[in-house]
Amino acid sequence: MQLLTIGINHHTAPVALRERVAFPLEQIKPALVTFKNVFLGPHAPNAPEAAILSTCNRTELYCATDDRAAREGAIRWLSEYHRISVDELAPHVYALPQSEAVRHAFRVASGLDSMVLGETQILGQMKDAVRTATEAGALGTYLNQLFQRTFAVAKEVRGTTEIGAQSVSMAAAAVRLAQRIFETVSDQRVLFIGAGEMIELCATHFAAQSPRELVIANRTAERGQRLAERFNGRAMPLSDLPTRMHEFDIIVSCTASTLPIIGLGAVERAVKARRHRPIFMVDLAVPRDIEPEVGKLKDVFLYTVDDLGAIVREGNASRQAAVAQAETIIETRVQNFMQWLDTRSVVPVIRHMHTQADALRRAEVEKAQKLLARGDDPAAVLEALSQALTNKLIHGPTSALNRVNGADRDSLIDLMRGFYQHAPRSNDQSGH
């Protein structure tokens, strides 16, 4: 079995492409079934394994397969599933085999490959991806072991380095950008659209600035109300957004919608109602919640996750010593995992040896049982059984020794000596 990771992320693709390749949560299980059965082959010698990690910043397919054409098949499947041409998608895709796939998984879970260096959210997202793949019946020995090692490495990196210390989160970056637009956030009305983890983080950071008003708009009213109460804010129905957008100076959106929920026309009307007072908008969703054309309006300052990345990277630069330490830990653990993977490569051979030996055993036992049933001497039957098993079991090694020459033969002789040096001795040889 070969490990392979196929994906795109914020390093290789803009948000405009990432949002088209993202998987809504409810689509991941059926997508995994299709991916396994159609492109990795349901009747392969070993059942293929797969997991999908889809976040704001990355979409990745983790695979374990015997199919040597899995790389091309996975890229083709990804493009066909999302109705994007291979020519458009392929330049942005990375394909990481074996140790590169292992190293990548370790780095992602440890926060080294995140836009926010050392952030912890990705670890939870990866665990969710593993849980979903397990429920879909898509995981097996190889990916299970990879992800369990991945989580252990992430824990080690975060526990022994300062990789997450003083990190500038996306939420903190949003506040910093708002402070560049407005003299003070405390005079502004802030609207958050959504009620997930990212909105909760953003609300925490903005609430610390004591804004004039803090409002949560969410599709599920009860959840929005609970979050608003935590920050002494108010909740409003998401359906009120088109008629009330003009009330807010700062709008931060991050929902799981597959289509934009804020269009150009609605924002144009809001700007007009505000008499062209500026609106600061942050779209942290992938796919995007706000139509990108909104950013072209004169009095609107629209930022996406990619725009916030520059501010985040400023904070990342100061923690390079921790990065180096983390990379050292990861490299050691990659080598450990590859050693385990190497041992797995002999499992099919060992299984075949057991199957062959057991077939020989059953055949000879059946023959012996017939002789005993016929009334033959039990001692003679046992002797014949043992002789037959001995001859058949050493036939393969003996033939191999006779076929090879030179250095190969010397190596094989040494190997055979090692096989049989601990063979048990008979009673007459043991001196008892």
Curated annotation (Swiss-Prot):
Q: Tell whether Oxidoreductase is among the UniProt keywords.
A: yes
UniProt xrefs under InterPro entries: 4pyrrol_synth_GluRdtase, 4pyrrol_synth_GluRdtase_dimer, 4pyrrol_synth_GluRdtase_N, GluRdtase_CS, GluRdtase_dimer_dom_sf, GluRdtase_N_sf, NAD(P)-bd_dom_sf, Shikm_DH/Glu-tRNA_Rdtase
- Tell me what reaction this enzyme catalyses: (S)-4-amino-5-oxopentanoate + tRNA(Glu) + NADP(+) = L-glutamyl-tRNA(Glu) + NADPH + H(+)
One record GO biological process? protoporphyrinogen IX biosynthetic process from glutamate
The residues the record assigns to binding substrate are 55-58, 114, 119-121, 125
Residues annotated as catalytic? 56
Pathway listed for it?
Answer: Porphyrin-containing compound metabolism; protoporphyrin-IX biosynthesis; 5-aminolevulinate from L-glutamyl-tRNA(Glu): step 1/2
The record's annotation in SUPFAM superfamilies points to: Glutamyl tRNA-reductase catalytic, N-terminal domain (SSF69742), Glutamyl tRNA-reductase dimerization domain (SSF69075), NAD(P)-binding Rossmann-fold domains (SSF51735)
Q: Does the keyword Cytoplasm apply?
A: no
Extract the signal peptide range. Answer: none
Which Gene3D superfamilies does UniProt cross-reference here? Glutamyl-tRNA reductase, N-terminal domain (3.30.460.30), NAD(P)-binding Rossmann-like Domain (3.40.50.720)
Which residues participate in NADP(+) binding?
A: 194-199
Q: Which GO terms describe its molecular function?
A: glutamyl-tRNA reductase activity; NADP binding
Please give the HAMAP family that the UniProt record associates with this protein: Glu_tRNA_reductase
**Quaternary structure per UniProt?**
Homodimer.
The protein's role, per its UniProt record: Catalyzes the NADPH-dependent reduction of glutamyl-tRNA(Glu) to glutamate 1-semialdehyde (GSA).
Its domain description in UniProt is: Possesses an unusual extended V-shaped dimeric structure with each monomer consisting of three distinct domains arranged along a curved 'spinal' alpha-helix. The N-terminal catalytic domain specifically recognizes the glutamate moiety of the substrate. The second domain is the NADPH-binding domain, and the third C-terminal domain is responsible for dimerization.
**Entry's family note:** Belongs to the glutamyl-tRNA reductase family.
Write down the PANTHER family for this protein, in alphabetical order. Answer: GLUTAMYL-TRNA REDUCTASE
Per its record, how is this protein called by name? Glutamyl-tRNA reductase
